[in-house]
């Protein structure tokens, strides 16, 4: 996508989407770009940063993520930008029968700081199966497994066992607005 994207057009489209959501009474808590769409070029990344700054919305950016791209991106950050420490998620090739032990390992690996855990909720029903036909994970079955795990007592137990404090993007956004 990035090789064909024009930063000004991406900016205009993103702003239109944010404004439309707010016009309908939706109060965004943060900005996230699907599959890192606005990380593709420095110009697109600058659009992402400016959107967050202009709307006083935290953006999904982490120290471990930015280290994987180019030093140029790091230099584009200001001291006022909120940068998470890390972003984690279940490996996409994890078989469902290993779900709980793999999440146990993932939760045990969380270090002090702010970590976003990416999850993919959904129901393994006809509608989602049709949308995800021939799609590798996260497909419909994957999304159902995430739903089942994160609504289970095992999830609550792992959070407590690993002394994890759950927070929301709303709380992070408050840091930008206060």
Where do the protein language model's features map onto the residues?
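Active-site mouth loops of central-metabolism enzymes
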Residues: 1-11
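Short, contiguous strand/loop micro-motifs
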Residues: 4-5, 35-36, 141-143
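Catalytic domains of cell-wall/extracellular-matrix polysaccharide-remodeling enzymes
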Residues: 7, 15-82, 87-99, 108, ...
């Amino acid at each position: 996508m990035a090789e064909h994207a024009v930063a000004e057009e991406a900016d205009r489209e993103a702003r239109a989407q944010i404004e439309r959501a707010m016009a309908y009474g939706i109060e965004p808590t943060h900005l996230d770009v699907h599959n890192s769409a606005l990380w593709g070029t420095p110009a697109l990344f600058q659009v992402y940063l400016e959107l967050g700054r202009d709307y006083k919305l935290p953006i999904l950016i982490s120290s471990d993520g930015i280290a994987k791209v180019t030093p140029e991106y790091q230099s584009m950050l200001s001291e006022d930008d909120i940068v998470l420490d890390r972003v984690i998620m279940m490996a996409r090739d994890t078989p469902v029968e290993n779900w709980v032990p793999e999440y146990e390992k993932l939760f045990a690996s969380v270090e002090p700081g702010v970590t976003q855990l990416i999850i993919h909720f959904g129901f393994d029903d006809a509608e989602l199966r049709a949308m995800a036909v021939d799609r590798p994970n996260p497909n419909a079955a994957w999304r159902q497994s995430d739903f089942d795990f994160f609504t289970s007592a095992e999830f609550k137990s792992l959070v407590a066992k690993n002394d994890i404090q759950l927070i929301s993007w709303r709380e992070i956004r408050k840091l930008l607005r206060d």
